[in-house]
């Protein structure tokens, strides 16, 4: 199975999980391709990033692999900011193509945990609206150990 692991990471936590997913897929003999989403003009202030997430702004992003036709599955990841996914992920969900009928998994990384369920639900709803079949969702606390993260991933991949 060929999987696109699409994520946005500001501090590195979501990137760490994205790379762990690639490793777990590889250990199962599957092909996982990392796709790191980046806004064209990224706000450097975390507070301003959270404000943009709260206001549901959708920044322009680099045109990184928007067409998913060559993939069987998409794994979509975001940090939780102000009870929402990162704005760049919202843009990606609007602009990606060939998602209909694909298997999908959502994951979030978080600090306090406030808003993680709401964020996963919103990501799942958007993927479903676009025609994907969401088969799993999972969350990772920012200080969660790698072994615990790996165990969660082994159960859903």
Per-region residue spans from a language model:
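Acidic catalytic loop of the alpha/beta-hydrolase fold
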Residues: 82-83, 113
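N-terminal beta1-alpha1-beta2 submodule of the flavodoxin-like/Rossmannoid cofactor-binding fold
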Residues: 1-77, 83-95, 128-133, 145-157
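Short beta-strand->loop
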Residues: 7, 78, 107-111
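A glycine-biased structural micro-motif
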Residues: 100-103
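Short, glycine-/small-residue-rich phosphate/pyrophosphate-handling segment
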Residues: 105-141
């Amino acid at each position: 199975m060929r999987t696109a692991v699409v994520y946005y990471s500001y501090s590195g936590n979501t990137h760490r999980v994205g790379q762990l997913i690639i490793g777990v897929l590889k250990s199962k003999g599957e092909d996982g391709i990392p796709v790191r989403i980046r806004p064209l003009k990224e706000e450097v202030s975390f507070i301003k990033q959270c404000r943009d997430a709260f206001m549901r702004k959708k920044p322009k992003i680099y045109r990184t692999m928007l067409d998913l036709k060559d993939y069987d599955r998409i794994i979509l990841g975001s940090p939780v900011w102000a009870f929402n996914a990162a704005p760049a992920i919202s843009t990606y969900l609007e602009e990606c193509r060939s998602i209909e009928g694909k298997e999908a998994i959502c994951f979030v990384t978080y600090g306090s945990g406030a808003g993680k369920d709401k964020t996963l639900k919103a990501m799942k709803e958007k993927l479903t609206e676009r025609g994907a079949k969401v088969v799993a969702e999972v969350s990772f606390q920012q200080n969660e150990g790698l072994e615990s993260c790996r165990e969660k991933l082994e159960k859903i991949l």
